[in-house]
């Protein structure tokens, strides 16, 4: 409903809204679909939302029928309880069917119901040792980032902004990969495949899936794979503060300790340079780094009574 209101508010009238939709639907290049006239994809513009994928052709009849019924109910409420179309409709469905503006909005509601499950992001805040979901948000710009079961970035929020930080070395020209809630270290590949097909309608072909990487408990420690004793010693020295940082992160004692981010990043770089990734250690360092990023961001705090 908020998306519909935003669309009408931005366009000022249904005629302009129709013009926008026609331009987006007829756009040939999928890479720039939804971009504004200044050649930018704005998070706060409706046309950016309208250009997002729906996967209509991949959805089941049952799925589309349910969303269609929901759209009809929402449209009926809008028409009979508000003056969004200029006046309140009487409780008469035939009047809706013959109104071209009502048909337009009903179609958009149906489209948005297909856009949302494929494109929204949940945002969480640290609460104790876990994260609490605070809501979901539709950010067209973030939909440009593809998924990997072994992502190289992490998302967290600071104030009213979403921040994306690297958690693995990223070379110039390499792609940034987010994670859609399906990490190879905790979810086996067959289950990830099932989840992706059910919600996103695609088969993941990331490096973790192509290599069929084992979960965390099946990974090797670096000492099991490295024969050179001097390299082993160097890695052990680099990781000497790992347990200490893990304890500080667990107890939420990372305030004014930004140096920990730098040291953990160095650990990750050394492991990448000398250990066949992934390893148990690199997963451990990355998880601690993610925890610290979460703690320096927004936190969910319940006041003590």
Report the location of each language-model feature.
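C-terminal helix/juxtamembrane-tail motif
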Residues: 294-305
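Catalytic cores of histone-lysine modification enzymes
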Residues: 4-158, 199
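C-terminal SET catalytic tail plus cysteine-rich post-SET Zn-binding segment of SAM-dependent SET-domain
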Residues: 2-30, 34, 147-291, 300
